[in-house]
Amino acid sequence: MDGFAGSLDDSISAASTSDVQDRLSALESRVQQQEDEITVLKAALADVLRRLAISEDHVASVKKSMPSKGQPSLREAISMSCITNGSGISRKQNHTSSVSIARKETLSSAAKSGTEKKKEKPQGQREKKEDSHSNDQSPQIRASPSPQPSSQPLQINRQTPESKSSAPIKSIKRPPTAEKSHNSWENSDDSRNKLMKTVSTSKLISKVIKNADKHKDVIVNQAKMSTREKNSQEGEYIKMFMRGRPITMFIPSDVDNYDDIRTELPPEKLKLEWVYGYRGKDCRANVYLLPTGEIVYFIASVVVLFNYEERTQRHYLGHTDCVRCLAVHPDKIRIATGQIAGVDKDGRPLQPHVRVWDSVSLTTLHVIGLGTFERGVGCLDFSKADSGVHLCVIDDSNEHMLTVWDWQKKSKIAEIKTTNEVVLAVEFHPTDANTIITCGKSHIFFWTWSGNSLTRKQGIFGKYEKPKFVQCLAFLGNGDVLTGDSGGVMLIWSKTMVEPPPGKGPKGVYQINRQIKAHDGSVFTLCQMRNGMLLTGGGKDRKIILWDHDLNLEREIEVPDQYGTIRAVAEGRAEQFLVGTSRNFILRGTFNDGFQIEVQGHRDELWGLATHPFKDLLLTCAQDRQVCMWNSVEHRLEWTRLVDEPGHCADFHPSGTVVAIGTHSGRWFVLDAETRDLVSIHTDGNEQLSVMRYSVDGTLLAVGSHDNFIYLYTVLENGRKYSRYGKCTGHSSYITHLDWSPDNKHIMSNSGDYEILYWDIENGCKLIRNRSDCKDIDWTTYTCVLGFQVFGVWPEGSDGTDINALVRSHNRRVIAVADDFCKVHLFQYPCSKAKAPSHKYSAHSSHVTNVSFTHNDSHLISTGGKDMSIIQWKLVEKLPVPQNEVITDASVTKTPASSSETARPSNSPPLPPSLPLTGTAEEESRMGSSPTLVENSLEQIAEPSEEQSEWGSEDLGVVIDEEPASELSETQGATELPEEERGITPLC
C-alpha cells in the first residue's frame, strides 16, 4: 500500500493493535491528501473551462469578421464530440491563450494546457484558411502527428500550437507510469498537467457540450448520424464508428475542403447479361423446353430462358428471393414460379408468393398468394382439363396447405391442410378437372375438389410395400395415375367404378393394379412424352429409361457419375431429352449420341473470383473444390479442375499465365491458366486464406490469412517460382482485404475488427505507425472495404460484416459493392461521404460474396454464396428519351419513360426501361415489379429512388440493423430422405 515502506508480516499486523491504529491514521492522512488534491483539481478544471469559453468567444468573433463557411466552429465542435468517445483531440486558436488536448498512447489520455510552444508543421501537411487568418494576431498554428502503436490503429496523435510565451516541451513517448512519476507539483502549470491526467472527463464533456450548443446549426448534418456511425472531422482525418469502435481515415492532401466533396449517383448502370449455373441440388422438376426453343430453369431469384442453339439468354426478374418451383401452363407460354419468404433492404419480411408471367414478353400477369403462404412455395401446377384456368399450390408451412386459385382473378377458391409430412409433388388430373393428387413422405392423397371444398382420399398400398417416399407423378393415356417411389418401383393406380360393399368407402377410389420395378434406388422423375411413351429418371443408378405404351422397357442410358444424380427430365426437340442433375448440370442428350452439357455451375458455396488482366476470362473457386475458368464473351466454360481443398480466393498474375488459389486449410496452389496444370503449392498456417494479391509488376505476392498474418513471397519466372520474403505481423484479427501501392513498397490491409493498417514492404514488412504518411498513396487496386475513398458505401448501423467485397473499376469512375442483403451496388468513386447514393441491383438470393470488373471495365462479375450463381452484368450509361415515350403492358400502368440505357462503349439504340405494376395492395405493389424486356436492369421498381441511398431514407437517423431471415429448410425430417438425397441441404 502507498505510504508504507516495505511489507509487514500478516500475523504481527493482526496481533498488534497499535499497528492497526497506525494504519488507520495513515489512511486518514492519505484521504485528506486526496481531498486536497481534488480541491486543486476543481480549481484547475474551472480555469480550463474559463479558457475554453474565452477561446470559443474569440473564434466566434473571428468567424463573424471573415467570409468563411464556419470551418473553425465545425472543427471545434466535432473535436469536442470526439472527446466523448475517448478518441479525439480539441484544437483551439486564440491570440491570448489556447488549450491543446493531445492524444497519448491510450484511449483515455488527458490534456495539457496552455504553455507548450508551437511545433514545426511537417512538409506536405495542409494549412486551413482559418489558420492563416489567425496568424495575423497570433503565432501560426501547426500540427505534427506522431506514430501510432499497432495495437491501437484508430488512435491519432496531434500536437497543437500554443501562445508565444509558452516554453518548448519535447514530445517524448514514454509509458504512462514513467510519465506520471516525472511530473511534479512545484508550480501551477505542472500541477494542471498532472490534474488533467487524473480527472474524470465526464464533467468536462458536459461543460464542453453546453458551450458547443451555439454551433448546433453548423454540425446538424453530422449530429443526425446514428451513434453507431458518426463521422467527425478535425483537420486531417475523418472518423466513423462501427459497432461503437472508431475508425480513423486521414484525408488526402489534394482535398482542400472536405465540405466541398459531393457524392452523386454514377452515370453508369448495370444490366444483367448472363447467369452461369442452375439450381438442381435441392430442387426437382424445374427444367422444361418452351416452343420458342428455350430451356426454362431457375437459379437464385432469376428465371432463365436459355436458347442453346443461338447461345442467348433472357431473364425473368420479378422475384425477390429464392425461386423454388416452376410450372408451365398448358398453352406453353405462361409460366408460374413460386418463391420463398425473404426480407427487404430494411429487414421487413417479404411474403412468399407465386408469380404468373408471360414467357414471350417477360411481363408479370398476376401475383398470387401474398399473405397466404408460409415460409415458401413448395410445388404448384396448372389445371389441364379446363385449359389452365386454375392453379394449385402447396406451401412450406408445417401443415403444407393445399390451395386452389382462379389465378386470373387472383382469388382463392379452396384451402385445406394436407399433412405434417413432406409433400413433394402436386398435380391436377389431365382429364378430371375435379381431381388433384399430392404425394410425399409415405403417402399419396387423391383430392376431390367441389366448389370451395376439398375431400381427401388416401391411397392404400395394401399388399404392396409402402415406400418411404412417393416422389413423382405422371398420367397415362387412359387416365391412370403412375407414381415413382424411393424403392425404385412404379405403381399404376386405377380408378375403380365398381360400387364398394357397404362401409368400405365411396365409389371411384384409386387402387393399385400393377407394380413395375424400374430403377435401382429411387424413381426421381417421370416425364410423359408427346407420343405417349414415358421417360423415367433414377436416382442411385443415374439411368434414363424409355418405356413404351405398355410400360415395357425399350431403351436406357446412364448419366455419367461426374454429373450427379437425376433431378429433372423433360422432353426436348425430336428425339432429344433434357436432364437436370444434383450437381447443377443441365444436359441435352439422346439414347444414340449420349449427353452434351448445356448449363453448368458450382455445387457448393462460392467465394473465390478473379478476372484475367487482359483477356475476357474469369476464374471462380468454391467449397466444391472446383476451379473453373469461364469465357465471358462466349459464355462458356473453358476448363475446370478439381483441387484437393475447398477454394476461397484467387488472383491472376499480371502476365496472365498463372493464377493463385487460396484454400480453407492454409494451402495455396498456382495453376497454369492455359493448361490448368499445377505449377506450385505452398502452405501458410493452417487457417483459411482470405485474399491473394499480386503486386502490379508481378514480382511479389501477398497472402492474407485468418491467422492474422500477411505472408509475402517473391515471384520469379512469370509466377512459376516462389520464395518466402517476409510476414506482416500486427493485425489483431483475420485479414479480409489488401491492396498494393504502384511502387510495390506499401500494402494497405483491412481486418475482421475494422483495422486499417499500412505496411512498409521494402524495409522488412514493417507496420507504418504514422498512418497519415500513407494518405496520399494512389493504390493500384482498391478492394479494401475500409478507407477514406470508400467509407461512404457503408450502411448506417452496420455490424461490420454487411459488405463482403468491394472493387474499384480500372478507369477509377465507379465502385462495385457486394453486400449481405443479396444486392450489388454501384457507387461513384471516390465515395467519401456517409450514406452515399448508389444504384442497386437484385438477382442473387443469397449473400453476394465477391465482385470484380473485367479487364476493360465493360462488365462486372458477381458471385452468390449459397445460391452458387455467377452473374455477369454489362455496364451501360443512361441517356434521355422523349418524355412521352411509354411502354404498354397488360398489367403495367402506362408511365413516361424517364431514361433509357445504351451499352458503353457501343452505340446501340435506346432500350425501354422496366415499369411498375399497378395493384391495390401496398405489398403487392412493392413486389409486383417485373421486367418488360430482357434489356431491363434489375433495379427494384418499388424501392426508393436512386437519389436516396440503398441503406436508408433521407433521414440520417434511420438505423438499419436487422438481419436477413434465416434460411428455410426444404423439408422436415430430412434424415429420412432416400440415400441419394441425404446430406443435401436446401440453399434457401
UniProtKB/Swiss-Prot annotation:
Residues 114-134, 176-193 have a biased composition (Basic and acidic residues). GO terms for biological process: attachment of spindle microtubules to kinetochore; cell division; mitotic metaphase chromosome alignment; negative regulation of microtubule depolymerization. Residues 14-63 form a coiled coil. One of its GO terms (molecular function) is beta-tubulin binding. It is found in: Cytoplasm, Cytoskeleton; Cytoplasm, Cytoskeleton, Spindle; Cytoplasm; Cytoplasm, Cytoskeleton, Microtubule organizing center. Residues 106-194, 887-988 are annotated as: Disordered. Phosphorylated during mitosis. Phosphorylation at Ser-144 and Ser-146 promotes its dissociation from microtubules during mitosis which is required for efficient chromosome congression. The modification Phosphoserine is found at S7, S13, S16, S61, S79, S134, S144, S146, S171, S200, S906, S908, S914. It holds the Pfam family HELP. Its main location: cytoplasm. WD repeats lie at residues 270-308, 312-359, 367-407, 414-449, 456-495, 511-549, 554-590, 593-632, 636-673, 679-715, 722-761, 771-829, 836-875. Keywords: Acetylation, Cell cycle, Cell division, Coiled coil, Cytoplasm, Cytoskeleton, Microtubule, Mitosis, Phosphoprotein, Repeat, WD repeat. One of its GO terms (cellular component) is microtubule organizing center. The modification Phosphotyrosine is found at Y237. Residues 1-260 are annotated as: Microtubule-binding. Residues 156-168, 890-904, 927-939 have a biased composition (Polar residues). The modification Phosphothreonine is found at T96, T201, T248, T620. Residues 944-953 have a biased composition (Acidic residues). Essential for the stability of microtubules (MTs). Essential for the formation of MTs. Required for the organization of the mitotic spindle and for the proper attachment of kinetochores to MTs. Promotes the recruitment of NUDC to the mitotic spindle for mitotic progression. Belongs to the WD repeat EMAP family. This is Echinoderm microtubule-associated protein-like 4. It comes from Mus musculus (Mouse).
